[in-house]
Each structure stands twice: as C-alpha cells, then as structure tokens.
C-alpha cells in the first residue's frame, strides 16, 4: 500500500498498538495524570506524544492556541456559607488583581475563571435548579471582560479543550491552595502581609470549607495545599510564581499553559478598596440584560419610572459614565428591610416590623410621597403584617409574574431585580451592615444620586440611638493610572 508512513517492523507496530491502547485506558479511568507525581508534563502549548518520535506527524496547534503561549488560568472560589453580595465583592478583589497582573510578562495571557454559583443559603425556593449557575445568568460578561480577562466556567472548559490536555474533558489543576487566616494576625501590634504553606496540620482536599469548586467533575488536582494567608490580593502573585517555578523543569516549558485554584478567596483583602480601580471594577459589573429588562419593565408598569423620568445616567457602556449628582429618581421610596438571620444575630440593630414601618412612614410624609417599594427577605406572614402597617400608603413588592418567570429568574435573579428597583428610587433606606444594602448604595452612586438620598440606615427604633452604615462615595478617574514598568525576568 502506498502512503507516507515510515517502514516499521512488526515488533515496532505491536509496541505502538500497546502504547496507544494503554494511554486510552488511562485517560478513561482518570488516572493518567494523578499517577504521575510531577505535573510538569501536563500543560504544554500542544500535546506532543511519543508518536512524533516514530511518525512524521504534522504540527497540530491551531492558531488560537499558538497565540496563547504562557496562558495562566486562575480558578477561585468562596466559602460555601458566604452570600451573593459578599461574593460580588470578592470578585472585585480578584478582578482588580488580575487586571494588574496581566501587565507582567509571564502573566500576559492570564485568565480569571469565574466559579459556578452553588445553591446559596438565602435561596430558599424549592423546585428550582439553583446550583451550578453560570455568571452569565446574573452578569453581562462582555461588560466584565472590558475591565478584566475573565471566563465563565464553561468558557474555561472550552479553552482547555483547545489545548487537548490532559485528555479533554478532564482538566489538570497544577496546584490548589486553600487560604486560611493566621491564628495570631498581629506581630507586636503590627499587621504584616505574609503567607506560608501549612505543614504542621493535616490538610483535607475533600472539605467544602473553601468552596465547592473542586467538586466539579472535570477537575483533577495535582497538588493540594493549605496556606495561611494575610494580606491584599497583590500578595497572590508571589504565591503563583512559586507554583510556576515548581512546575517548570527547564527553558522548554517556561511558557507552558498553567492552571491553578485559589479556595476561600474571601480571605484576600482588597488591593485598592474604595479608589478609582475598585470603582472601575464595580462599574463593569453590569447585570445581565435579561434581568435589567425585567427590572425596567416592572419600574415602568408598577412605579411609572423610566431612565429618563428618573434622570439617571445609564449609557450603553460603563466606560461612558461620568461624575453626576443630580439624579432625581422615581416617585417612590425604597426600603431594604433585612429579616431572616438578622432578627436573631443582629437584634441590637435590626428594627421590628412596626419600628421599620414607623420610620418609613415618617420619611414618606417628609417627602410628600405615598409609595414605598419594599425589598426584603421577610416571610409571607411578615409581608401580610407589613401591608397592614402601611394601610394608608401604597406598598409595592416585586414577585415573578408567572412560574415560567420564576424558573427563569430564580431566587438570585429576583434579588437582582429588587436591587435595580431600589437603585432608581427617589430616596433609599437600608439595613445596618447588610451587603445587600451596600450594593444598592454603590449602584446609586454610579447612577448619580446625592449622598443624602442614598446612604441612609434603619434605626432600631424611631427616635432612638442609631448605628449607621459608613459613607463611601464613588471615585472617578479620567483614565487608568495603574500602568507600570514590567521588571519581570521572564
């Protein structure tokens, strides 16, 4: 038979057949990589097997892979007990870090992989699929990507298949780090940025305390570490460089693709809390257009409010937003009244239903308004009581209009709509130390409301002493000022 195959003897063909079948079996049972102690050969720019030593195979790297030499994928997750709005804040910490990290030569192709949303503590509805949700369900990924190089989890898997390594759809994670707090955080009264791998205590890979990310069926972890960590996100660069050095055998694999995981990322502090970098990342967190449309339709139909009538700024791209302080808002007041565990764990600062209603009615009279939109996790019984307390006023509360919409939005989407409606109110009052309230503060700062109409907090009782949330105004910048010279040796 004519062809370009080299002339191989019968023993060589038998050896080739044996190696091919053995490799295939190893990949099928998921042990091909875990049985190899050293992960250095697991992440090449193209898979180059022993076949190239026997057969004259052509180069198989597609152009999109050749252009991603040195890609570093950073997966992260958050403690399973943390809620939706704290997770948004953790994202900002990681996004600001990765945006700056990509200026380094070794990390020029870094990707931040967004973890699937697990079923969170506050998502109580039954009969809804509320685990493993992609970030695209809640956020506009194109908007996020204009700030930082992020990938939804399924997009990450798709890119991994381009590399064909170590046997798609399995993904080799070179190192996974579960971050922990130091037991003693101050040294002679001083807080110092530092980290160290834990060697004096057992470190369980199976624990979900750092988040359920590693339960994803596609992930195979090479080395798992517990790390005591204290400091801001920038310290993670040193941790990642140490891992890259351990995985690099020589010059030939310096630019190999790497994948690492950071668990309990809420341990990491902000590099730039409250400055223009923080606010650029926050402004990029536009909600999914589907959710924004549901909120816009509800505001128009139930509250007779549009972008134009509210006088807010909402350009198509967050980059076009400018400093503004003259937003008017719709003809309604929004109250975020946190109930649930706050009633038990924060009794000293959480008002009763009657006390909250008294405060809201006083505000409505002061602003000559009759409508209050209520965002709350109150029980159905508590909602009935609140309606009675507001019997001379109009109480509005968002609920999905059908079971189809409820299945589409899910509990997290309903909460997003609540926030978007509160963001457009003439006046807002929130709950003390609630991250849900904090995110509404931020949204209203971006839309252009005055601080006096935004940074307001429910008191325990009308006329009593009152703990109030802090005021942190938005910070604007004409352009990015985070450019810096790259002094990396490689």
From Swiss-Prot:
Q: What is the effect of changing residue 442 to A?
A: Abolishes enzyme activity but no effect on protein folding nor secretion
Question: GO molecular function: any one?
Answer: peptide-O-fucosyltransferase activity
- CDD domains for the chain: O-FucT-2 (cd11298)
Residues with attached carbohydrate? 29, 79, 368
Q: Its Enzyme Commission number?
A: 2.4.1.221
Which residues bind GDP-beta-L-fucose per the record?
81-85, 336-338, 418, 435-436
Q: What class of enzyme is it?
A: transferase
Which residues of this protein are annotated with the site description Essential for catalytic activity? 443
Compartments in which it is found: Endoplasmic reticulum; Golgi apparatus
The keyword Lipoprotein is annotated on this UniProt entry: no
Give Gene Ontology CC terms.
Answer: endoplasmic reticulum; Golgi apparatus
Q: What does this protein do?
A: Catalyzes the reaction that attaches fucose through an O-glycosidic linkage to a conserved serine or threonine residue in the consensus sequence C1-X-X-S/T-C2 of thrombospondin type I repeats (TSRs) where C1 and C2 are the first and second cysteines of the repeat, respectively. O-fucosylates members of several protein families including the ADAMTS, the thrombospondin (TSP) and spondin families.
Q: What is this protein called?
A: GDP-fucose protein O-fucosyltransferase 2
- Origin species, per record, is Drosophila melanogaster (Fruit fly)
Q: Which gene encodes it?
A: O-fut2
